[in-house]
């Protein structure tokens, strides 16, 4: 399946592909 977006994002970027930091401080599916 798709990678889970749940890491904390720093600098407005997420390491997981397809994830967004708009829900800072935790990445979510964009």
From Swiss-Prot:
- What are the protein's UniProt keywords? Disulfide bond, Knottin, Plant defense
Question: Could you describe the post-translational modifications of this protein?
Answer: This is a cyclic peptide.
Keyword check for Disulfide bond: yes
State the InterPro entries in the record: Cyclotide (IPR005535), Cyclotide_moebius_CS (IPR012324), Cyclotide_sf (IPR036146)
Crosslink feature (Cyclopeptide (Gly-Asn)) location = 1-30
Write out the GO biological process terms: defense response
**Among its keywords, does the record have Disulfide bond?**
yes
One Pfam family, short name: Cyclotide
Disulphide bridges in this chain? 5-19, 9-21, 14-27
The record's annotation in PROSITE patterns points to: CYCLOTIDE, CYCLOTIDE_MOEBIUS
Domain comment (free text): The presence of a 'disulfide through disulfide knot' structurally defines this protein as a knottin.
Q: Which family does it belong to?
A: Belongs to the cyclotide family. Moebius subfamily.
Q: What does this protein do?
A: Probably participates in a plant defense mechanism.
- Put simply, this protein is called Varv peptide H
């Amino acid at each position: 399946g798709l990678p889970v977006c749940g890491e904390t994002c720093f600098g407005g970027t997420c390491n997981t592909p397809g994830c967004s930091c708009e829900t800072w401080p935790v990445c979510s599916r964009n």
